[in-house]
Amino acid sequence: MNFSGSPVQLPLLQVHLPGEVPYRTAWAWQQARLAHMIRDPQLPDGLLLLTHPAVYTLGAGADPKFLKSLSQPIGSPAIHPESPSEQEPEILRVERGGEVTYHGPGQWVGYAMLNLKRHRPDLHEYLRQLEEVVIQTLAHFGLQGERIPGLTGVWVQGRKVAAIGIKVSRWVTYHGFALNVCPDLAAFEAIVPCGIPDRPVGSLVHFCPEVTMAAVAPVLVESFCQVFGLQAQAVSLAEWLGEPRLSDKLLGESTAQTPKRK
């Protein structure tokens, strides 16, 4: 499937949309693809677009004070707890930059894995490009996305609708962006989102009540391709991981349906 519909033969972007995936699982998928991309510089760029069950994550240098009243222990995505709580979302410290944020249903999370040696090896420019992906997506729905000097992310009418946090290894990127479409914004009240106390969080549905997750997904992919000069190709999980001989069932893929444009 060609998301962009472009007749020009652009470099490929391998896209996988598995639905809802636990954070630890998606983290492991990124680690697997990262190893392949470092080992094989010819492997195409990749985008994993999914949703998570409720979870809070902190960047590598994030300050726990922004957790406010949350008292759960801070874990690692690489270590599975012996007795996970079914009542409270986990709190995980990960490699990305940035402070604490929330992921949950109603939010598209995009894990962008690009070899920046094929683009522009400039991390500040890369952050601005991820913001531009969101800004172009918002424009499709008639919304004006805004940047705030000195901060990373995208705002609409003063409300932050997209958070961005990245990690780069040998110029291969991972982690990425989170776009609030229709999440439960009450979940953000337990934290100081991104460590910014005076900037409220918002969502697309607040400004466009009829917008759906299914409608936003293909626009995000198309905007990503426009910004980075790529052509999207939908692939299986095994292909996305660089392990085409393995079945998705063995890799533990979510059984959720891939969203389609309405």
Swiss-Prot record:
Detail which positions bind substrate.
96-103, 163-165, 176-178
Task: Report the enzyme's class at the first EC level.
Answer: transferase
The domain of life is Bacteria
Pathway the protein takes part in: Protein modification; protein lipoylation via endogenous pathway; protein N(6)-(lipoyl)lysine from octanoyl-[acyl-carrier-protein]: step 1/2
What's the main place this protein lives?
Answer: cytoplasm
Q: Which PROSITE patterns match?
A: BPL_LPL_CATALYTIC (PS51733), LIPB (PS01313)
Q: Name one GO molecular function term.
A: lipoyl(octanoyl) transferase activity
| Keyword terms | Acyltransferase, Cytoplasm, Transferase
Query: Which InterPro entries does the UniProt record give?
Result: aa-tRNA-synth_II/BPL/LPL (IPR045864), BPL_LPL_catalytic (IPR004143), Octanoyltransferase (IPR000544), Octanoyltransferase_CS (IPR020605)
User: Where is the protein localized?
Assistant: Cytoplasm
Catalytic function, reaction form: octanoyl-[ACP] + L-lysyl-[protein] = N(6)-octanoyl-L-lysyl-[protein] + holo-[ACP] + H(+)
The answer on whether this UniProt entry bears the keyword S-adenosyl-L-methionine reads no
Catalytic residues per the record?
194
GO CC list:
cytoplasm
What does the record give as EC number?
A: 2.3.1.181
Site, Lowers pKa of active site Cys: residue positions: 160
Pfam family name, one: LplA-B_cat
Which positions fall inside the BPL/LPL catalytic domain?
41-232
Family under the similarity heading: Belongs to the LipB family.
Q: Identify the NCBIfam families for this entry.
A: lipB, PRK14345.1
What HAMAP family does the annotation carry?
LipB
Misc remark for this entry?
In the reaction, the free carboxyl group of octanoic acid is attached via an amide linkage to the epsilon-amino group of a specific lysine residue of lipoyl domains of lipoate-dependent enzymes.
Report the protein name in the record: Octanoyltransferase
Instruction: State the organism named in the record.
Output: Synechococcus sp. (strain JA-2-3B'a(2-13))
Q: What is the lineage of its organism?
A: Bacteria, Bacillati, Cyanobacteriota, Cyanophyceae, Synechococcales
